[in-house]
Amino acid sequence: MMRYEDVSQLSLMNLTYEEQRLENIRKNEDLLRSLGLGAPSEATTLATPSNLKTAGNQRRYNDTLVGKSNTGRNRSDSPRKRPTKDREDLNLVPQSAIKRRQSVRLGGKEKPNYTREQVTFNSDRDTPNTPSRQIKSTHSHPGSEEEDIRQVKTRTLGVRVHNPKTFGHIPGIGVGKWWATRMEASADAVHAPTVAGISGNAHEGAWSVALSGGYPDDIDLGYAFTYTGCGGRDLKGTKQNPKNLRTAPQTSHQSFDNPLNAALKRSAETRNPVRVIRGFKLQSKYAPPTGYRYDGLYIVEKAWMAKGLTNGLMVCRYAFKRMDDQGPLPQKDLDHDDDNKA
């Protein structure tokens, strides 16, 4: 005679994708409730800024979150204007008579070619204050040009002041700090990887995670959320995107043997705080309208294996809870967003 558990498992195997997704969401919600997570504090509602990529609007957005700048002084929205010189007399002087300032030390030397040389740093190095110099050879191989472009786009950030491989807040970076790109968040040492969602190792645990995109059966309550691990994808990618491993379908079980999954599992054991940033691609009302935002420190309350949405393959799951006394999380004005899309 078939047991009730067997009938239940059989019915789950016959679920459609959407039914399985809703079932997984229900289980995630039940698990968060079982951890005793209370109701979140009242959230701050923010309208969608029109353009956050300018320095002035970025300051206004950050000041909306924390009230004042990190230095405690109110910042002026208008940029400081430099005094302009009267150029009327300069027009009377012929251009040939105007000489540019020239270094005595460089005088007589060959003019440097800055297009051949680029100072970069590796986001995963143990010594964040030591830059590595990448020299682009004039006799580079055909396949190296794409790598050079990728390095310029993702790693020419300057030298970090702080080490991202530390637990807790980064000095000088307050909760609510906003960046236009993940590269800027990496430069500030809040979340070092510019692509990967988990930063850490199996021995110490995770230092930070990024919520951006995510899995469709994860839930985000702001003060708590579930997070799905990485791995299990076909390394060849898809037919349309053969090198895009992020969009490749899952073809095998995830495992805690994966170093990044093991890092979050270790964090559940040590209960060391994990920095969390949310990105605009996250399907959540707690996601920023654009860019990426630092939402403070969370504790990994639980790590477990669960059935995913692809052919019953298993995934690594984690439950996060936000630490107290970090202020309310901002919340998107969904009505305002809908009006803009109309």
UniProtKB/Swiss-Prot annotation:
It comes from the Eukaryota. Residues 41-149, 236-257 are annotated as: Disordered. DNA binds at D218. Keywords: Nucleus. InterPro entries: PUA-like_sf, SRA-YDG_sf, SRA_YDG, UHRF1/2-like. Residues 168-322 form the YDG domain. SUPFAM superfamilies: PUA domain-like (SSF88697). Signal peptide: none annotated. It is found in: Nucleus. GO terms for molecular function: hemi-methylated DNA-binding; ubiquitin protein ligase activity. GO terms for cellular component: nucleus. Pfam families: SAD_SRA. Residues 42-59, 115-141, 238-257 have a biased composition (Polar residues). Disruption phenotype: Mildly decreases methylation of the fifth carbon of cytosine (5mC) in DNA; simultaneous disruption of CLR4 exacerbates the effect. One of its GO terms (biological process) is protein ubiquitination. Residues 74-90 have a biased composition (Basic and acidic residues). Involved in the maintenance of DNA methylation. Binds hemimethylated DNA. This is UHRF1-like protein. It comes from Cryptococcus neoformans var. grubii serotype A (strain H99 / ATCC 208821 / CBS 10515 / FGSC 9487) (Filobasidiella neoformans var. grubii).
